[in-house]
A protein has these predicted regions:
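Conserved active-site alpha-helix within GNAT-family acetyltransferase domains
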Residues: 137, 149-151, 160-177, 183-184
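Conserved GNAT acetyl-CoA-binding A-motif
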Residues: 117-119, 146-159
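Active-site rim helix/loop that mediates acceptor-substrate recognition in acyltransferases
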Residues: 34-56
Length: 205
């Protein structure tokens, strides 16, 4: 997998991939049901700007697939970005829509494990034009190799049950489930214990 760390110079590319990848997602298509494309793009750009504070936003060379990780001890948004996110929600979604989005985010926060340090897979998406080639899972597998080298655990939420078995094949196990408000979809949470790097092959004399 030919992957690299994304920078702010890649923001346009990674934001487009994430926006299109999650356009039909059971959770986020419901939460962002009302804004126009520019409004949705603004949400994702702000979220990615928060993640790009860390060197853990990964992309294939042309941005066909993107993974967004928050490292141990990190936050998805700075306090200033959180305030901007709330203002954007109210202006784009209205009071009711912003309240629903806030309730959705609270569900994710409440379910998030606290205790053992871990890498958090906030987002993983493939541009619709490049789906069906395993790029997202290949990028995730490459990332996990780096996380294993640190002996660290990993956590994710699966908003699409079609992906659960794919995550399990990469070592994630069921952690829990929660329902989103207003009869929303079920979100599965998954945990992958720290493993350590693969041992080097033994060379015999």
């Amino acid at each position: 997998m030919d992957a690299r760390v994304a920078t702010l110079a890649d923001l346009d590319v990674v934001a487009e991939t994430i926006q299109l990848a999650f356009a039909d997602d059971p959770v986020w298509s419901r939460a962002f049901a009302h804004p126009d494309d520019r409004g949705v793009a603004a949400f994702w750009r702000l979220w990615l700007e928060g993640a790009l504070r860390y060197p853990w936003v990964w992309m294939t060379q042309a941005g066909e697939a993107v993974s967004v990780w928050i490292p141990p001890g990190g936050d998805e948004l700075s306090p200033e970005q959180e305030a901007a996110f709330k203002r954007l929600a109210e202006s784009s979604l209205g009071r009711r829509g912003a309240s629903y989005l806030d309730a959705v985010m609270a569900c994710f926060t409440e379910a998030h494990p606290h205790g053992e340090p871990h890498y958090y897979l906030s987002l993983l998406g493939t541009h619709p034009a490049h789906r069906g080639h395993g790029l997202g899972m290949a990028l995730l597998a490459e990332n996990l190799t780096r996380i294993d080298a640190e002996g660290a655990a990993a956590y994710l939420e699966s908003s699409n049950s079609a992906n659960d078995q794919r995550y399990q094949r990469l070592g994630f196990a069921l952690h829990g489930r929660f329902n989103l408000p207003d009869d929303g979809p079920i979100v599965t949470t998954m945990w992958r214990p720290g493993r350590g790097p693969e041992p080097s092959p033994i060379r015999r004399p």
